[in-house]
């Protein structure tokens, strides 16, 4: 007898810097000092927020992103590497 189990664990987060353009994601965590949390939240970059990469600048330049709440932003790659996200298609 062969049993099949569907794996339902949440996918592992990846960083915003790794994403292709056009995919909506949800922020799971941001690796920055706690003192920066209010600034990041004002930009729409806090856990639970959704965003998408619109385009990437050439030669490692900034990512142009759209957030659901704060509009469009240009993020430097260092910050984008510190924003951990999961697939946003399952988000409400």
Model features per residue range: what roles?
Residues 1-92:
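Compact, glycine-rich, soluble single-domain proteins
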